[in-house]
Amino acid sequence: MFKHKLTNLIAAAAVAITATFSLSHARADELATLKDSGELRVAMSGQYPPFSFTNDQNQVVGFDASIGEAIAERLGVKAKIITTPFDGIIAGLLAKKYDAVVASMTITPEREKAVDFVGPYYHAGRAIVVKADSSIQKLEDLNGKIVGVTLGDAHEKWAKAQGNLTVRSYKGLPEMLVDLDAGRINALVMDSVPVMVAVKETGQKIRILDTPNIEGGRVALGIAIRKNNPELKAKMQKVLEDMLADGAYEKISMKWIGSDIR
């Protein structure tokens, strides 16, 4: 009887060890799979200049695209840029349509329940943008006004939570700026960096409200990957830290933004 119980215990322990090893191996598989495939599929909207947009050669370029390509290169693989609407970008990641999201995504507790983040890879501030000659001077002046936001981003959620704004959602910044200039919206709410870069190119006259205490005034943005991939996360984090340390990140940031936005 004792021998039989001992045999059962040994068998059970073996199963447990095998299961633990299999789980550990499965969690490491994604990094190995990427290296085997030779490709890192990177998702972004393609509608968010200067972070991701389509150039005259029909190529998706920008800060996010360059960061994704640089990370892939240091992982020893090639980057495949995939554009997809931002509001469904996490769902696409979980469905394994791509391997990472480099799309200026704000790190939030809600998103951290669904995905893991590498980074932050830059920081930005929430901006309330109006036309230069607008009568809107402070946050309270937005009461009852129409504001534009990017569909699915953290600023859309913030604007809708205010309860006193009419919120109009857009796929990207260019359409928002056109509607702001035409008076179809009174303001737009989004990260400050892309707005400043965009209007520098278009010559559009805008003003950013002074809102030092606004929620999300300075936020961290990260690279999203699927959960339970500790080796992939650690490797990508190390690659990003190396880029920050050796000047590669600053070079990309200066090219697309004109300043170091880490």
Which sequence ranges carry the predicted segments?
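Sec/Tat signal peptide C-region and signal peptidase I cleavage site
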Residues: 21-28
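Extracytoplasmic small-molecule ligand-binding "clamshell" domains
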Residues: 29-104
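Alpha-to-beta junction loops
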Residues: 40-41, 76-78, 95-103, 146, ...
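Ligand-binding cleft/hinge of the Venus flytrap
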Residues: 52-56, 68-77, 139, 152-171, ...
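Short helix-initiation/N-cap motifs at beta->coil->alpha
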Residues: 65, 81-91, 134, 153, ...
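Extended ligand-binding regions for polar small-molecule ligands
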Residues: 66-74, 146, 151-153, 218-259
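Periplasmic-binding protein-like
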Residues: 123-130, 192, 196, 200-241, ...
